[in-house]
Regions:
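N-terminal signal-anchor transmembrane segment
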Residues: 1-62, 80-86
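Membrane-interfacial loop-to-transmembrane alpha-helix junctions, especially the N-terminal start
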Residues: 9-21, 62-76, 119-126, 207-208
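Aromatic-anchored segments of alpha-helical transmembrane domains
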Residues: 21-31, 75-86, 132-139, 213-220
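Membrane-embedded alpha-helical segments of multi-pass membrane proteins
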Residues: 29, 40-59, 97-108, 187-197, ...
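Structural signal for the C-terminal ends of transmembrane alpha-helices
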Residues: 54-65, 110-119, 199-206, 233-241
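Aromatic-anchored transmembrane helix interface
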Residues: 73-77, 90-114, 125
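Alpha-helical transmembrane segments of multi-pass inner-membrane proteins
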Residues: 124-148, 167-220, 225-238
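Juxtamembrane non-transmembrane "cap" segments at the membrane-aqueous interface
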Residues: 145-166
Length: 242
């Protein structure tokens, strides 16, 4: 009897950990695709993983959250406004319907996945990925200035969409060193690492804070620097007010 209970608990923890890992790794995998047909249909790696995990979670609990339905109604309303706007501007109606359907599916799947108890695992994976990305940023920064070849962060063997590009850690237009870690652009890294930075700040992990702050500054991304300064000031104000 104990073995059965342990197996069930292990299964729940495993699924929870997988969902948390998916939410953490999704921003890294976002630009990569499985298949692209013309300019109207693109199936991303994240889409496949999201649908698969949603089916696994749904097989354990069939309950449909009220807030999910509320979100869908809002998205449907915004989508209809967009469609009416297309009617006025004579733009592609089929593409608008496709986008509306896709975002409704995303709303259902992501809110359903997020209700699983995956927050702790999500934050753990965020920290691990942020540390790896930050270390890579420092290596890219040093390599760029020394003139040594370095991995640009793009995952080998995975394809990008037709209209997507990979910025790399050297700006092709200006030649500036703008480390991007394992993200498509330097600003995306700044946004992602800021989550780990806030978490480290709250837990007073000084070494991690410094690592994240250095990597965000090295990107020279305006977005990353603004987020770094803003979050630091806000957290200090909150701590002083307590």
């Amino acid at each position: 009897m104990e073995v059965t209970v342990n197996r069930r608990k292990w299964g729940i923890i495993s699924l929870t950990g997988t969902v948390g890992f998916f939410f953490a790794i999704a921003p890294v995998l976002d630009p990569y695709i499985v298949i692209e047909i013309g300019s109207g249909f693109t199936l991303k790696i994240n889409d496949v993983i999201m649908l698969f995990l949603t089916m696994l979670c749904f097989s354990k609990s069939y309950r449909f959250e009220r807030k999910t339905g509320f979100l869908c109604i809002w998205l449907l309303g915004l989508g209809l406004i967009g469609i009416f706007g297309n009617l006025a501007s004579n733009t592609d109606m089929a593409n608008s319907f496709k986008n509306l359907i896709v975002w409704l599916i995303y709303a259902v799947c992501l809110t359903y996945l997020w209700k699983t108890p995956c927050r702790d695992k999500f934050l753990q994976w965020i920290e691990i990925i942020a540390i790896i990305a930050s270390i890579l940023v420092i290596l890219q920064f040093v390599s760029g200035y020394v003139g040594i070849g370095m991995w640009d962060g793009r995952i080998p063997g995975l394809a990008l969409g037709k209209y997507d590009g990979w910025a790399g850690y050297i700006d092709v237009n200006t030649g500036d060193i703008r480390p991007n870690g394992i993200f498509q652009e330097a600003s995306y890294l700044g946004i992602y690492v800021s989550v780990a930075y806030v978490q480290a700040f709250k837990e007073e992990k000084i070494k991690r804070m410094l690592l994240y702050a250095i990597s965000m500054l090295m990107t020279t991304s305006v977005v990353a620097i603004i987020i770094l300064v803003t979050t630091t000031v806000l957290i200090l104000i909150m701590k002083l007010s307590l």
